[in-house]
Amino acid sequence: MTVHRKRESMRENVVKNLQNNLALDNCVLHWDGKIMPDNEEPGNVDRLAIVITASGQETFLEAPKISSGTGENQASVIVSKMRDWSVTDKVKALCFDTTATNTGVHNGSCVLIEQALKRELIYLPCRHHILELVLRSVFESYWPTSSGPNVPIFTRFKDKWSEIDQQKYVAGISDQGVFGVIGDTKEQILILLTNYSQISQPRGDYRELLELAFIFLGAIPPNGVMFKRPGAVHHARWMAKAIYNLKIFLFRNQFKLTNSEMKGVRQVCVFIIKFYVKIWFSATSAITAPNNDLKLMQELLSYNKINPLVSKNASEKMAKHLWYLSEELAALSLFDMNVSLEIKKNSYSSKIE
């Protein structure tokens, strides 16, 4: 037996053991399509990552190839894999990106999965996807989509990086315009950052965002001050753009910016520190989502007194994605420790009347 075939045999045995030993009562099904290099032929291929979560545990099922990312193709593959893993009766909810491919009322993946299972499921839209749309609306307040996915300022900064003295960064909070907006809440934000930094993050860019937020506020991250070389800026990764904005502002004394660019970078950074970090790192909790989304909407509307443009664009975008304030999902707040008992009682009473 060749090494390749032996590896394949071992992988098949591992999968079978996982399938046989998977002990779940109720779970949430997650999926996300990705374009990846094909490991068999030259070029790229569409793959659909399928995961189930239950009781704080995550199980990766498979990432099969799909011919195209249509709702019908996705649903067909997902249902097939659910049956392979014997979890069709255990899946109670779906977590997905809020694209038409998934949410379409006739041919969306969600409704087609329900039809295949012959029962309704709870919809738990991916809040990270929703929040990236909100960040995009803020970013495009200063850099319209006509600038393209690779905004010239990021390309310039990336090319300039080798000339920048990383020891001579300037904290964002030292800027008068920044301090005037977030100076009063600096300590509260740092407490949140400290709490989030103690939690294992699934991606390197999540950790980098946390570290840059510490530095922006004039503090030292738990692992010290370090800066990573600016990477690729893909139009679909708004996290990368957030990281670029923070770095540019930290090195604003070494990187030449026009007045318009300085204003845009400053305002995007303020939004990231004041709003985005908190909502991003709490996004995975469905129980706290209703209360968090309600507070976010209230804060975005109140922000009109400080920045009417950002307030308008961000609140309008968020208003289109208030899934967790629906009657069905708002009930999750009954389990939220941050919601007062009085509010829970009133909410419960209104539902049974």
Give the positions of each predicted feature.
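Alpha-helical structural modules in large enzymes and assemblies
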Residues: 1-353
